[in-house]
Swiss-Prot record:
This is Glutamyl-tRNA reductase. Homodimer. GO terms for molecular function: glutamyl-tRNA reductase activity; NADP binding. The active site is at C51 (nucleophile). Pfam families: GlutR_dimer, GlutR_N, Shikimate_DH. SUPFAM superfamilies: Glutamyl tRNA-reductase catalytic, N-terminal domain, Glutamyl tRNA-reductase dimerization domain, NAD(P)-binding Rossmann-fold domains. GO terms for biological process: protoporphyrinogen IX biosynthetic process from glutamate.
Length: 416
């Protein structure tokens, strides 16, 4: 019997150096979905890849989905199982249902209740839909997760306090520079995280902000909103020495900022310190950059303490959110129980249509060669009734007395 299964590598167990090894870049995701969908016993699949988690959601009838998914993840990223085994989380059936709802509502996020994950989950869903790797069960699962997340947002205060990775990034920079408004900030990338950082920095009255991105039009959109300068990604190395704060979040598959570049920038700055925050997965900044004097390099994992300092207000709403998830999951499980019945009814109706069409075609031919319309129509109706009721009648006769009452409940509806 098929089941829902999830393999997860996330911030709770895996450090950034592991997460970046198993991350999927957007340009390779469609092929990755196709490869996974091609594995025997995988009926449907979705892949979520963010800075804090890589998760594979499948509907499968493999005997050991965990083994299949773990081997797939290791093979596609060309790493050994030993490298990732200690960091794997696996969920199936009810646990999988709870987990996907926890993810969608932000209860499983590094930042409790953060809203960005829901958008990322929806993007993963739409990517799978475009790749044609969904089926009815996985479609229903994700629609359920989305509606549950909406209900949690509506019925609780979990998203009220301004705690997000972008917010905490700006808070962390304030630990290095007391007055952000006097600093020059370089933001690399043009995704949602960078746009949120720009928004928070703008609220801190930062007037000298540079947005660098591979597609300069996307950088320009953010720059226009916050009176910033926009440049292409190839140009950022020529202005990096001007930046007191650098926050990077691109989808690059290899680091774009190396130790040599920063050494050169520090010389031009006469070793004035630089705060650098790498919130990309895989990382945008080589770890060796952090060895340099006057460089304060942080990764997304270093945000945890800032997050904990600001999380108190949301923690109170967590229990209420979990209660909502439990109630919503009961509704989904009820749908899951009757799913085989839906498939049986669909099959029965399809078979009935085949019988009807065959007999109808025969009756039409007879009418063309005979004027006895009434007898032909009566014969057609009798044959159709007999053929449609043959198998159900046979099954009712073979049904035990104990189960007969269930059949009797359906019979009156036939008269309607």
């Amino acid at each position: 019997m098929s089941q829902i299964a999830i393999l997860s590598v996330n911030h709770q167990l895996a450090p950034v150096e592991v997460r970046e090894k198993v991350a999927f870049t957007p340009d390779k995701l469609t092929q990755a979905l196709s490869d996974l969908h091609g594995i025997y016993g995988i009926y449907a699949c979705i892949i979520l890849s963010t800075c804090n988690r890589v998760e594979i959601y499948v509907n499968s009838d493999n005997e050991n989905p965990k083994e299949v998914l773990s081997n797939y993840l290791a093979k596609i990223h060309n790493i050994t199982r030993d490298r990732i085994n200690p960091y794997l989380n696996y969920f199936e059936d009810n646990e999988a249902l709870t987990h996907v709802c926890n993810v969608a509502t932000g209860l499983d996020s590094l930042v409790l209740g953060e809203p960005q994950i829901l958008g990322q989950l929806k993007n993963a869903y739409h990517m799978a839909k475009e790749a044609k790797t969904l089926n009815k069960l996985l479609e229903k699962l994700f629609q359920h997760a989305f509606s549950t997340a909406k209900k949690v947002r509506t019925d609780t205060q979990i998203g009220v306090s301004p705690v997000s990775i972008a917010y905490c990034s700006v808070k962390l920079s304030e630990k290095i520079f007391e007055c952000l408004s006097e600093q020059t900030v370089l933001l690399i990338g043009a995704g949602e995280m960078i746009e949120l950082c720009a928004q928070y920095l703008n609220k801190k009255k930062v007037s000298n902000m540079i947005i660098a991105n591979r597609t300069i039009e996307n950088a320009q959109k953010i720059a226009n909103l916050y009176q910033a300068q926009s440049i292409g990604l190839k140009q950022f190395s020529s202005v990096i020495h001007k930046a007191d704060i650098i926050i990077s979040s691109t989808a690059a598959s290899v680091p774009i900022i190396g130790k040599g570049l920063i050494e050169s920038a520090l010389k031009k700055r006469k070793h004035k310190p630089i705060f650098m925050l790498d919130i990309a997965i895989p990382r945008d900044i080589e770890p060796e950059v952090g060895q340099l004097d006057d460089i304060y390099l942080y990764t997304i994992d270093d945000l945890e303490q800032v997050i904990n300092d600001n999380i108190g207000n949301r923690e109170k709403e967590k229990n209420l959110a979990q209660e909502i998830i439990i109630k919503q999951n009961q509704v989904f499980n009820q749908w899951l129980k009757v799913l085989p019945n839906e498939q049986l009814v669909r099959s029965y109706r399809s078979n009935a249509n085949l019988i009807k069409n065959k007999l109808l075609e025969k009756a039409i031919k007879q009418i063309k060669h005979s004027g006895d319309y009434e007898n032909i129509i009566r014969k057609f109706a009798d044959q159709l009734t007999n053929k449609l009721l043959h198998l159900p009648s046979k099954n009712i006769k073979q049904t035990s007395t104990d189960n007969l009452s269930q059949c009797e409940g359906c019979i009156p509806n036939i008269k309607k």
